[in-house]
Amino acid sequence: MPLESKPIGGNAAMRLIATCLMFFVPTVALSEPIETQKIITALTGDWNGDGGTDLALIVQTEPTEPMDMHFFLRDIEHNYLKPVEVVRDQILGEWNGYDRPGYENSDTEPELTALPNNSIRLFLPAMPVGSQRTNQTLTIAYRDGAFVVAGFSYDSEDYLKENTKAGCDLNVLTGKGESGKTNEDGTTSKLPVSVPGRVIPFANWSFATGLSGCQGS
């Protein structure tokens, strides 16, 4: 029977997270304390395909600063969630104040979805600044002991102008994909993308890297 993978929230999320944090060891760099109020979203799944239930968290840091993504793999033999990687400076989103005074709840937050092939879909919505908005989606997979970007897609539009939509869907590992844009007359043009495949750790990823691949360079 396949392992069920799903995002979690509310009390269920807090119970799982609290259980996870019980196993943090202060002497281990990856096992840093996490304030539960700063956890934006959590996702369970089997990232390394060993049959255990693993965990991914997106955690706020400070206002105006990028969020962190924490990855845990279950140690099946000893039955605990082991922190294996923290990726910083990759995730933007509005600061969510929850019940803290001086901050409002946000409506621009990253989203996590578990995929059937043990990978993670990370949706990064456009920040509400200016008229040009670009949403990004990354597919993150565990390969050879690290979390890498297996797929990249984006869609952009200038909401103050007509016919400005553009987008791309790229398999980073194979270098194959498709790009498209809306022309001035309202028609849509699509072009195949073919570049050398790459294995890029999530920690080293940049939007410019994905955009360059979509442009065939």
Question: Where are the regions a protein language model picked out?
Answer:
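Blade-edge motifs of beta-propeller repeat domains
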Residues: 32-35, 77-104, 192-197, 201
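Short, surface-exposed coil-to-beta transition loops
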Residues: 54, 66-68, 107, 132-137
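N-terminal signal peptide c-region/cleavage motif recognized by signal peptidases
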Residues: 25-26
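Acidic/hydrophobic-patterned starts of short beta strands in beta-sheet-rich repeat architectures
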Residues: 49-59, 116-124
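Short glycine/acidic-enriched loop and turn motifs that connect beta-strands
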Residues: 62-64, 129-130
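Beta-propeller blade termini
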Residues: 38-47, 99-118
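Beta-propeller blade repeat segments, especially FG-GAP/WD-type strand-to-loop junctions
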Residues: 64-89, 139-144
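Acidic, small-residue rich beta-repeat scaffolds with periodic aromatic anchors
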Residues: 111-217
